[in-house]
């Protein structure tokens, strides 16, 4: 790894739990393929992507896609520097040059014409042709990992040509064992009774969301971990869960439903 990008070697906060998925992703990347992680909220897509970059010892480039993402945001744009017009390199350009792992976050949020600039980068050509500048060859270690939530508000259907350039891994929903492992890793001193109740609460919400009884807003693993963290600071469990999970529903009827589910686990 080159000296100027060593600060991009980031150790993930948490390991990824899920041997089979991890093996599939590692083998795919070793064979020179790019990976697309598809799954609903709280399935660990970004955690897996960060862990893969760390395991391979490559710099990480996080590229968040949104409706206004265009090719200049990915590859770069002209800028004025030292009385000259120069190319300000975008994250995809840098990732390709330094052999990084580009995490294309919420890849289905961008317009398809913006993402089409990646086509030559992701297939057998492995080049980026920058108009008015050089053609750059992809570093042999460079890989791209896309993440997406299918069917969420603001998302679009992915272009078939783009999907064909990825190996797609469907991330399974969290199980009780995985959830317990995550909580124990984050909070080693957590009591078994509390562990059971928090895991149970999250799984109850996950089941309700899968059956379309509630939205996915309260299905928030980051929120649950933050709530446990706040409890360590002395806030009551009810108030902490309200901040981390319940209050993320702004619809009053749904919030009451979530409060009832929470009440069965944390009286």
Q: Whereabouts are the PLM-identified features?
A:
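C-terminal engagement/docking regions of AAA+ P-loop ATPases
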Residues: 8-9, 237-267
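Juxtamembrane/interface motifs at transmembrane-helix termini
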Residues: 199-202, 216-218, 259-262
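AAA+ P-loop NTPase catalytic core and its hallmark functional loops
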Residues: 1-203, 210, 236, 264-267
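Residue-level signal for secondary-structure boundary elements
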Residues: 191, 207-214, 236-239, 252-253, ...
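Small/polar glycine-rich anion-binding or flexible loop at a beta-alpha turn
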Residues: 46, 223, 243-246
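The conserved phosphate-sensing helix
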Residues: 214-226
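A short, ordered amphipathic alpha-helix with a cationic face
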Residues: 169, 214, 232, 247-248
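Short, amphipathic alpha-helical segments that act as regulatory/interfacial helices
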Residues: 29, 203-206, 225-232
């Amino acid at each position: 790894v080159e000296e100027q990008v060593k600060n991009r070697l980031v150790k993930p906060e948490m390991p990824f739990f899920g041997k089979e998925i991890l093996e599939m992703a590692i083998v795919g990347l070793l064979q020179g393929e790019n990976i697309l992680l598809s799954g609903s909220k709280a399935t660990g897509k970004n955690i897996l992507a960060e862990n893969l970059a760390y395991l391979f010892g490559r710099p990480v480039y996080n590229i968040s896609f949104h409706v206004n993402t265009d090719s200049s945001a990915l590859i770069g744009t002209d800028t004025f520097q030292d009385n000259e017009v120069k190319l300000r390199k975008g994250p995809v350009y840098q990732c390709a040059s330094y052999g990084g792992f580009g995490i294309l976050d919420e890849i289905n949020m961008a317009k398809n014409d913006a993402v089409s600039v990646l086509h030559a980068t992701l297939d057998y050509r492995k080049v980026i042709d920058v108009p008015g500048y050089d053609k750059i060859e992809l570093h042999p270690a460079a890989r791209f990992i896309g993440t997406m939530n299918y069917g969420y508000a603001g998302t679009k259907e992915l272009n078939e040509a783009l999907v064909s350039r990825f190996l797609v891994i469907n991330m399974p929903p969290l199980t009780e064992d995985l959830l317990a492992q995550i909580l124990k890793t984050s909070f080693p001193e957590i009591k078994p009774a509390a562990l059971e109740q928090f895991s149970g609460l999250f799984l109850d919400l996950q089941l309700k969301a899968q059956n379309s009884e509630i939205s996915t807003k309260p299905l928030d693993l980051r929120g649950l971990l933050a709530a446990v963290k706040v409890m360590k600071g002395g806030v009551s469990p009810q108030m902490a869960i309200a901040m981390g999970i319940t209050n993320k529903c702004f619809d009053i009827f749904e919030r009451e439903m979530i409060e009832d589910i929470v009440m069965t686990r944390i009286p």
